[in-house]
Structure formats: C-alpha cells, structure tokens
Amino acid sequence: MLDICTDITGRKDLYEQNGLAVKAQIDKIKAQYAEADIQDGERKILLLRAASSFVKAKGSSGTVLGEMLCDMGCINIADSNTSLLENLSVEAIIWEELYHIFVVTMGSDTEAAKRSLENLMKENPALSTLDAVKNGRLHVMDKTLFNLKPNDRWAESYEILYEKLTEK
C-alpha cells in the first residue's frame, strides 16, 4: 500500500525510508531472535487481552501483538487449545507450562483494564504459581504499540518485543 501511495505522490524516497528501511530493521530483529539461544519451551506463550470488564485469551491471528509473536516464532497455546478463546481455563494454562504471558489492554481506560487483570489473578491464585508470573515474565504491553498498528513505530515495537522475549 505504501508503495502505491508513494507512486501517486511521486515520493519514492519515502517508500525507501518508511517501508523498506523499517522492514530491514524488523528482519534484523527477527533474525537475532531466531539465532538466539532460545529453547522451544521458552517460545511457549499466552496472549491475553484485558479490558475494563474482561480478560480473554487471544490467538495469533487478528491481533497486532498475536501476529507479531507468531512472526517472531512464538507458540501461542491459544492457537492449539481454542477452548481458551471461549473460556479462560486456569487448569489449561497451568498445564501448558508457559514461559511468557503477554497482556495487551484495550479501551480508553487502561487502569480499569489492568484492574481486570489483577482481579483475574486474585480470583485464581493458582495463576501466581506459574513460572512466567513468579519469574517476572508476565508482560503488560503498551497498547499504542501492540494493540493498535504502530505505524511509523513498527521497528520499535519489534525491538521491545525482542527484549521481552529474550529476558531470562
């Protein structure tokens, strides 16, 4: 799309700058992650979307962060256990032994969305026993970079994601 727009405006330099250069940055980040010493179990994640009135598991497709995680080579348990998409099963989450849990908020009230997540954790104390939670790998991500398309900040989004995924 950017290629077409820059054809119309006659500004191919912007396609190079805002399209190809950003793609090259992202490809470099993805290659670094692929080459990192990451075990298969460390690629296992769960993506949650939190709003003021709910917290739901999300699959890899149809969400910005889900597609980015898939693009990086992560394994989202909600993709293979689709019952999680309908009913957030604490037992299924514990059984999967996740390495990371990513949460992205939605809606205008981010604090209310975070409270929904806190309530989920309080109502299900078994979630606190997850290694991902105990070891600080429950990541609440910036919705402007990971729920909405980050536009000119795609490379920054991938860099932040890379940093979270490679934290030990």
Predicted regions and their residues:
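Structured C-terminal subdomain patch of bacterial secreted/periplasmic proteins
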Residues: 103-168
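Basic- and aromatic-lined ligand-binding clefts that recognize polyanionic substrates
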Residues: 14-72
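Proline-aspartate-enriched helix->loop->beta-strand connector
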Residues: 90-103
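Short helix-initiation/N-cap motifs at beta->coil->alpha
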Residues: 81-90
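Solvent-exposed, acidic/flexible segments
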Residues: 11, 15, 19, 58-62, ...
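Flexible loop/hinge segments that line or gate small-molecule binding clefts
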Residues: 1-8
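Structural recognition of the beta-strand scaffold that forms the well-ordered cores
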Residues: 43-49, 77-79, 100-104, 138-141
